Amino acid sequence: MKTHPMTALERCATALLTAALLLPSAALAQREGVDVGANSGFASLVPAKEIELSAAKQYKTLLAEAASKNALAPPEHPQLQRLRRIADQLIPFANEWNPRAKSWQWEVNLIGSKQINAFCMPGGKIVFYTGIIEQLKLTDDEVAQIMGHEIAHALREHARERMGKSTATSIGAGVVSQLLGLGDLGRTVTNYGVQLLNLTFSRSDESEADLVGLELAARAGYDPQAGVTLWQKMSASSKGAPPQWLSTHPAGNTRIMDIERNLPRVMPLYERARKG
């Protein structure tokens, strides 16, 4: 069978995809805290800035819809002030996990709804629903665990990674030409933007977010043991019709055991933070 030599574009496409998939991240230096390894090379297939811009647009639309229903909490709302105070304590520790976080325009908002839900979109756009706070009767330590978990998804760029994997499955000369600036990749990312709120993460992503969130909360002075009580509450609340947050955040004994196994790594950070 006659074979044809690869074109320059095909060679470039092969090299680009290989680099993205095999990209070895620099080994993490010995550090205190949890060990979740390096970010996936798939994320490099999608520009971070485009994802963050799409997220910001979707976030703005969500807040406008909530405001039109009188469901967006005003700045003086006690629970919103509480959330923003906790966020202010967590965010300074985000930069270690993702240097882009330094330039993010962080936002924290509260929407009145019975939904047991919360999220942090790429670029640091955080939303909590009143249902998750009120129905679970969350302590500050437990709020910090949820917020840390959601921030961790953004810091570890799990949404970008998922989109990168989707790109990789259909990659070809046309897609690669877009990645090389020869096409309109922005349109592809914009199409993904409408799906950002509906993305579900893998079990690996969820475990990683649990641990990174655990460390963020500990460094900010919130008790890591609240990660256990939080998931006990979540498990109890999931009986019957599971809440939306749990439908994309699988809970269970394995998850609690994983947190307990990592407590010795983060308790010293918490104790140091408490001492000031």
Spans of model-derived segments:
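A Zn2+-metalloprotease active-site environment signal
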Residues: 2, 21-276
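Bacterial N-terminal signal peptides that target proteins for export
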Residues: 2-16
